[in-house]
């Protein structure tokens, strides 16, 4: 039988304990690096959230300052939470069942849109803008149509045609090439039919207010946060 001397046992123990210490140090360094990455990611997201909030408040303030005197005349509403301006008078916007812009609405757009886009192209906001949505909305009814499904589809086609007409009209008025290209890259036309109705206090459909056109601003905060999360997952 081989007798292991105490000094050999001690050397083996030292070797094992040394290896264990090295493994613990590696684990500690990995943990620190992992926690550091999480903290860095959280800091980046916090900065984006703060920038988003400041941008939202700034745009809302500037829109309110610019258009307060006009909103009532246009029968329009500014929603600070969604950064949208909503034109609510269907008689001003279009003829019933038609996608052609009324002259009164063209006059409003001639006044509104250049001032609107001037705010968004301000250097403090320009790089934060992801999308400018033109949304067309209708009531749930369609003249002579009893089927709610067919009424929805008819209104979908109409609302899409209307937003396309609005987009074409406002873009055709921009003569500066750089401004045209920037606006074109951000502007979208979205016909939503009766999918987002406006209701009265008693929860009945407000058909007049449901027939509307909205200009809605979307910032790129969500896109930046998703980019950070995607990078950190690699």
List where the protein language model places each region.
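Short terminal targeting/anchoring segments
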Residues: 1-61, 67-68
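Short, solvent-exposed beta-strand/turn patches at coil↔beta or beta↔helix junctions
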Residues: 79-110, 141-154
């Amino acid at each position: 039988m081989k007798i292991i001397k105490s000094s050999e046992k001690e050397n083996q123990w030292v070797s094992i304990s040394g290896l264990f210490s090295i493994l613990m140090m590696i684990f500690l360094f990995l943990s620190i690096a992992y926690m550091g990455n999480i903290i860095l990611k959280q800091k980046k997201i916090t900065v984006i959230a703060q920038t988003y909030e400041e941008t939202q408040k700034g745009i809302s303030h500037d829109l309110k300052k610019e258009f307060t005197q006009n909103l009532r005349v246009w029968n329009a509403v500014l929603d600070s939470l969604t950064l949208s301006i909503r034109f609510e008078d269907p008689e001003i916007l279009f003829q019933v069942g038609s996608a052609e812009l009324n002259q009164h609405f063209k006059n409003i757009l001639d006044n509104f849109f250049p001032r609107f886009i001037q705010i968004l192209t301000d250097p403090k906001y320009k790089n934060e803008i992801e999308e400018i949505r033109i949304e067309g909305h209708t009531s749930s009814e369609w003249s002579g149509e009893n089927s709610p499904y067919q009424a929805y589809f008819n209104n979908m086609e109409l609302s899409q045609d209307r937003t396309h007409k609005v987009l074409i009209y406002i873009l055709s008025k921009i003569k500066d090439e750089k401004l045209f290209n920037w606006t074109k890259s951000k502007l979208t036309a979205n016909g939503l039919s009766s999918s987002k109705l406006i209701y009265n206090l008693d929860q009945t459909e407000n058909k007049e207010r449901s027939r509307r056109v909205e200009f809605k601003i979307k910032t790129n905060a969500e896109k930046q946060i998703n980019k950070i999360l995607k990078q950190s997952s690699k």
